[in-house]
A protein has these predicted regions:
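Conserved ABC ATPase signature
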Residues: 147-151, 155-157
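ABC ATPase NBD Q-loop/coupling interface
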Residues: 67-89
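The feature captures the beta-strand-to-loop junction immediately N-terminal to the Walker
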Residues: 40-42
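Catalytic Walker B motif of ABC-type/P-loop ATPase nucleotide-binding domains
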Residues: 172-175
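Helix-to-loop junction immediately C-terminal to a conserved catalytic motif
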Residues: 55
Length: 234
């Protein structure tokens, strides 16, 4: 990894699914600590598969030495050597936000955000402090007792972001997080991601919205049919 700066390293990563469909084709990339990186490409280009490699939901094919390495703090995940039973603990050092929110429908906003902390046995005082900080970050503290079904799409996505950030992750992964939102809410959610990055968290965001990346200073990695197009900016 060298110097502790490199957080994510893909080396010749290919992923094949049934009927020889290659979701990723010989992808090599590097993402450094503190970066904000866009992942773009049409539907089916391989964006979600690439993100799944980062949060260890998939492993590369065993061809050309395909390997994914992710360093979060003092922990290193290696797709070749890390056992499955080590992955859950490693994932707790990152946050993941999806397009469809994935909130618990029978729990209020506060409990949705607190859920992951309760699972790992955090004390109530610690949970309260962390949840209030996360809700303040996304600007939804006033809705902490609301049930998900009473919230707008933009509000639900804010709750999902708060849940992903409640344990202060090193890395935030977002898979089309504004895909179900109107332009105003999408822009507000994007502003939250920029603030999260400004506070030091590395952000990798898959999006098909050119309004975000065309005039942005952040690096963009573009996929087409599983191949990384702009290899020269790695």
């Amino acid at each position: 990894f060298g110097g502790g700066v490199l957080m994510i390293h893909f080396s010749h990563v290919t992923k094949t699914y049934e009927e020889s469909w290659k979701a990723l084709r010989d992808v090599t990339l590097r993402i450094r600590k503190g970066e904000f990186v866009f992942l773009t490409g049409h539907s089916g280009a391989g964006k979600s598969t690439l993100l799944k490699m980062i949060y260890m939901d998939e492993r590369p094919d065993n061809v050309r030495g395909g390997q994914v390495m992710v360093r979060l703090g003092d922990s290193v995940y290696d797709s070749k050597t890390s056992p499955d039973n080590s992955i859950q603990g490693f994932r707790r050092k990152m946050g993941v936000v999806f397009q469809d929110f994935k909130l618990l429908p029978d729990r209020n906003v506060f409990e949705n955000v607190a859920f992951a902390l309760r699972i790992v046995g955090k004390k109530p005082k610690e949970i309260n402090a962390a949840v209030f900080e996360a809700l303040a970050l996304v600007g939804i503290s006033q809705k902490r007792f609301a049930m998900p079904y009473t919230l707008s799409g933009g509000e639900q996505q804010r709750v999902a972001i708060a849940r992903a950030m409640v344990h202060n992750p090193y890395l935030l992964i977002a898979d089309e997080p504004t895909g179900n939102l109107d332009p105003k809410n999408a822009e507000e959610v994007f502003a939250i991601f920029k603030e999260i990055n400004a506070r030091g968290t590395t952000v990798v965001m898959a999006t098909h919205n050119p309004d975000f990346y065309l005039n942005s200073p952040f690096r963009r990695l573009e996929l087409k049919q599983g191949e990384l197009l702009n290899k020269e900016i790695l």
